[in-house]
């Protein structure tokens, strides 16, 4: 099982690097999904308090994107992130 996790982590790290080299910028909605999956994969469930500034829409959107991934294992989030980046690469 450890080997599978190590392989997934390598694939995830490769996908993170590739996401920075996409030829077309993904939509804001897709970027938020990527952000949520990345945070879930690297930190696990979002246990933070929501942003306190009601006018900080970017932080609120990021918070909610991560919160939307709650319950997924880190490996599941990594796999979904890899799949999404591969799809975006075409």
What feature does the model see in each segment?
Residues 3, 7-90:
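A charge-rich, low-complexity, intrinsically flexible signal that marks solvent-exposed coils, linkers
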